[in-house]
Amino acid sequence: MHGDDNIRGVRWRHGPHIWTLSLLIGLGLGALLAGFVPQRLNESGEPVIPLWLVAPFVAILLSIALMPFVSERIWHRHFPDFSFFFGGITTGYYLRAFGGPSHGMTFGQYNVVHALVEYYSFVALVCGLFVVSGGILITIRGRGRPALNTALLAFGAVLANFVGTTGASMLLLRPYMRLNEGRLRPLHVVLFIMIVSNCGGALTPVGDPPLYLGFLKGVPFLYSLSHFWPQWALVVGLLLGVYFVVDTWYEKRHAAEVPTADPETLRPHRFGVSIEGGTGLVCLALMIAGVFIDPLLKKYAKIEGIPAGATFQLLVAAAAFFLADRRLHEANQFSFFPVKEVGLLFFGIFLTMIPALGFLSANGSALGVNNPTAYYFATGALSAFLDNAPTYLNFLQIAVAPEAVNAASIEALLSQEAGRAKLAAISTAAVFFGAATYIGNGPNFMVRTIAQTSGIRMPSFFGYLFLAIIILVPILILNWFIFIR
């Protein structure tokens, strides 16, 4: 495939040796900057995170958004270098500048290690589910029509709460594209991302990472389902309505553009669904089970801080790949290019997010975040550009301050009506606003890459953001007006 050829070229001509050089240059520059900037401590003796340290994160976002326009060829060959360089700047600065003690390490070391562990878990889940789903072939017999497509996306929104937004996206994207071969437009995929890859997963901790982190911290497992389902129904229902209108318009336009088409091709086919890949289905169940390994180890064996669940998921993904029927891989047009692109880009994103999240954690309460409306829009705005899971935790910390986020503080928060309103604002905003950009939630970028390697010309970073502003944001404002304010 074209994308594979690109990444293969990167690997051999601009591979790990050049990536390492880019990382080392970034580390050196970050360490050099740390030597010129005096460090300050707050009243608690912790380092003050300067706002300018967010610059590498902004730079990597601008690179993702603009470089494909400046030179698509340079970007495809060198995007890992951008990621490693900017990630290296942040890492070098933290390791040299922040030498105070924290959790048995220096403050800088702890934050870098914590970010890398989160990155490892992210890659294990997102890329692991992609590999596993490549060995599952779902065939939907019929022709893509507005009603059928809308029903499929509605099913995906429900499924996301059982296998996660990433799992639902990876399972349904390929059959969705095959069902609509010849009539699929970029907006079809954009709405798939909004509905299946994000907003659909707002009902259970399995659905989306922010809710899972809330569950680990003490939010009851069924709390989201029992309290957020009206918001889920409103947002998902309106997005499905938009999808149906858009797809109906495309259907009429497509029919008008092919007036001489064979009537047989326009006649509805008998509907049917078949699923192949029993090994992949077993591995999918194991991948979801892997999500619960770390909390179980913490609860019953008092073991924490070791990403055992992520390691288990990677082993399951490897087994799924080697045991899969190659015929199913070929039918799914399986390629490792999406895994490579997401894995390499998010390496830099996770590292450069460290100061952004640190600044938010230290200054959130001073930024006027003290009511449900402020929590909703602040959590949402940052979830669109930062990873929505740590953003959720940071605002949850602000909500329970000065207590730490734990089962006791969560119970106290939920015992008050104002506390429940804050949690609703934080939780729904983190999930829903994650759909506003390609990097707001794990599966977004993966879906975009799969679609592009299949020949669909997806919107740019800013193009997608523009569509989110005119489609998604009005719906989320309506959600605020009805349920949050």
Describe the role of every protein-language-model region:
Residues 1-39, 43-53, 57, 88-89, ...:
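Intrinsically disordered, low-complexity non-transmembrane regions of multi-pass membrane transporters
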Residues 18-22, 26-41, 203, 213, ...:
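Juxtamembrane and boundary regions of transmembrane helices in multi-pass small-molecule transporters
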